């Protein structure tokens, strides 16, 4: 049996990751996901913009012939995560939402120490395998002594904003055509003072 414990009210509600999904692992779990998943666009262009003061330089790489298991797609995580949770439930997983894991239950010492379950306030759940998906904020792992605290200097601040455009407007603004998708990374001094 598989139990998925979701801290948010629904899958994806607490997700802070951007909206790009790489297919190499997903394809192993759901081979026909391209036909059924809520995918927005296949990424066919990569842009990196570097800014300083009032100047910006952008590098673009375009590709069309990507091997099927090496591609990526733009997704809206709330839709995608809901779909993926439903897929897990179809395969027999039990999803519980709005439940926070407050502690990892471990046994053993030193290198033989392992996670054997989780505590959710007063409730405990034990398992042969526990997959921890707490992202960059490794609070549970740190509290259990299974990883060192994250050095703030190794972290980055990400900003995500979702806009809704008509298809034609989106393609004009981002210089795309058809079903082309774009991944765009910006960096530079425009973030000075935000930390």
Language model regions located:
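N-terminal Rossmann-like FAD-binding beta1-loop-alpha1 element of flavoenzymes
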Residues: 1-4
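Predominantly flavin-linked oxidoreductase catalytic cores and closely associated redox partners
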Residues: 7, 78, 83, 87-195
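N-terminal FAD cofactor-binding segment of flavoenzymes
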Residues: 7-53
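Generic structural signal for well-ordered, non-membrane alpha-helical segments
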Residues: 15, 19-23, 41, 73, ...
């Amino acid at each position: 049996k598989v139990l998925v414990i979701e801290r948010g009210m629904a899958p994806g509600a607490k997700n802070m990751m951007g909206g790009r999904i790489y297919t190499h692992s997903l394809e192993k779990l759901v081979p026909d996901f391209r036909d059924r998943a809520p995918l927005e666009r296949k990424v066919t262009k990569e842009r990196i913009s570097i800014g300083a003061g009032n100047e910006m330089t952008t590098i673009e790489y375009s590709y069309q012939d990507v091997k099927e298991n090496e591609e990526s797609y733009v997704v809206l995580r709330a839709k995608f995560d809901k779909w993926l949770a439903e897929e897990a439930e179809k395969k027999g997983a039990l999803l519980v939402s709005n439940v926070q894991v407050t502690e990892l239950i471990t046994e053993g010492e030193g290198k033989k120490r392992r996670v054997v379950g989780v505590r959710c306030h007063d409730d405990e759940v034990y398992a042969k395998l526990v997959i921890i998906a707490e992202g960059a904020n490794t609070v549970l792992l740190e509290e259990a002594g299974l990883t060192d605290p994250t050095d703030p200097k190794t972290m980055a601040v990400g900003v995500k904003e979702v806009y809704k455009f008509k298809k034609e407007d989106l393609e004009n603004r981002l210089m795309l055509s058809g079903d082309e998708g774009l991944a765009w990374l910006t960096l530079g001094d425009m973030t000075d003072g935000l930390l």
